[in-house]
């Protein structure tokens, strides 16, 4: 009798397990009648879209609200599971079209000036890139002669591989140099009062229960008395660990890094570091992260490692899309987070809005103003570069850190 009970119990358990396996391996039947999709199923490339974003109504609820892969252009079948009004699992299937309809990004001045005989290269002066295409066609329409004085009306045209086009008109003024005149003793320059931002004023304006006030430093600040810095009210410091000497250049340790980080830690300041990068590939960025990790291995950081990339003058020659540049930054930050450090991306407001659009990392915002209107997520705000604080004899950047990790 016991043997029969054991056999029956084992069989029951087997059937339950078999049912679970079948439910996993055999998807629910397709039923596209229980929901309604939006009319236009064109999805912008690199956009963060979930299944629910494309459904206007459903008789039940979505079970698998997955994020769609939008990194590849073209038609893509989407399959998801939902429960219908009868609480039965069904499968919805539809097709989206991932498209690139974004114009290339062009930054230029409304007018340029050059002396007759100048070797000005306008193509190098103008920033031209694209969200998807790593090598958009960028050209100047119209004729001009750098050896002939005059005003030339020109048009800068940028076209990507998906035929998106940006056209911007601008003016080139080619001028003759002014004739030499008799040398005269120049009038004495007016003395102007130096405009500075006092650390105490920043504390008075921005310190509250959710914020801390600190600084970021490098070799440009020289020798620092961190005891005075702390006594002045600073609670943290971001220390430059080093920089890259141009595109494909060597990595150089900031000559003040060791004394800065050691003295900051000795005075019980919270410490993070940043690296000034010219990386033009994911491989290069990971290599830089390894280098930074090696420099900081003997120190205890309580704040993030920041990736500081600002070489926009060299960007035209890098053959990177905007998405590709974001991948470069992510490669650096992924590497440091793999070693259980926090990663952070440094950028100014305009660059964060226009260029650093395809990442999910914390942001160190640079925006020199009393009250920033940057409306995306950031954890630290560099609000000035002309700060003054006891313990430092030169100007210094002042920062606000948000304790709840968000602003």
Which residue ranges define each predicted feature?
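Functionally critical loop-and-helix segments that line ligand-binding/catalytic clefts
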Residues: 182-217, 358-407
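Aromatic-lined carbohydrate-recognition surfaces of secreted/lumenal glycan-active proteins
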Residues: 340-353
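Hydrophobic alpha-helical membrane-insertion segments, chiefly the h-region
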Residues: 15-25
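Serine/threonine-rich, repeat-prone extracellular segments and beta-strand-based repeat modules
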Residues: 57-94, 133-174
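Substrate-binding cleft of extracellular glycoside hydrolase catalytic domains
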Residues: 207-232, 238-331, 337-339
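Solvent-exposed, low-complexity, repeat-rich "mucin-like" stalks and linkers
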Residues: 26-59, 102-133
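Extracellular interdomain linker/stem segments of modular secreted and single-pass surface proteins
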Residues: 97-105, 173-181
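N-terminal Sec-pathway targeting helices
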Residues: 1-14
